[in-house]
């Protein structure tokens, strides 16, 4: 990506402003995402197993350190985790939908009424929904945050068109499929049961209604795989940006990995609202 912009500007050996800004912005963005990841994992394990966030955070950081400090381990772990977690989550959601088919019309009615209703429009509800959708959409896929080209640039394929189609499919799977699965799980639970809840507590309470304690544990395990694979992925992206800015040497590469682990630790023990507000910024 950086080389493309340098060639575009006719300066192959000099760093141009746009490529430098891209690299810096990416690193800042990924630091925020690291905190959101660990915070979600610790919250889910607290709800499922009543484990204090500090203990979960320490274990998470240790596991991450063992993996990221080993050369070429990132992609190998991702190749194993991502397909398994996506399929399992999708299958469980289909089971919940099929066991609650009678409630589906009411779910879709509620979605459209609360998003586009007259009361919501007058009260500014549509703008709030749109704003939250944009902010959370940045975390559901990478097209909005601008980091998707990092994955496309590293892909090995015989045509850029194929790479583009794969990236488009990734947005569809992440946002339309996976996020819709989460929405169905929560909306198919009784409204009075989840009233006033948010974050992991909301999702796991809804899953407990559908599948009992197994559902709560399943969400914790699945979220761990989702979050951990995302963390490893952003480290893979950050590696190229760090190498571009500071050189591909042991000091710079180790430094950014240590910083990522520190952010992972801070996010795990920080308050939910603080982490998400920082991530939104």
Question: What kind of region is each of these model predictions?
Answer:
Residues 18, 22, 26, 39-45, ...:
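Membrane-interface loop-to-helix entry segments
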Residues 82-95, 175-179, 253-264:
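Small-residue-rich segments of transmembrane alpha-helices in multi-pass membrane proteins
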